Amino acid sequence: MNTPLTDLLGCRYPIIQTAMGWVADANLVAATSNAGGFGFLAGAVMTLEEIEQGIAAIKAKTDAPFGVNFHMYVPFAEDIVDLCVAQRVKAVS
């Protein structure tokens, strides 16, 4: 299915799995992305190290694109952005 959203995010279906705190972990994100949706890791409830581990776990389970959600007001927000860029995460919110 081609829509502006699927073209932008590189997913098969225009379905976004939101970054629900304490629920949207690497397993859910990878499963969503593998099913053709676009999964978001709930980084807003994680430390930088947990986000890094989550990204690695997602990449071990899927080659499909995914995103990371986080709060811009955390002291390490710039580090999260740098991590997402370095890991080629498709989207952040």
Which residues does each PLM region occupy?
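Active-site entrance/lid segments in N-terminal catalytic domains of soluble metabolic enzymes
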Residues: M1-S93
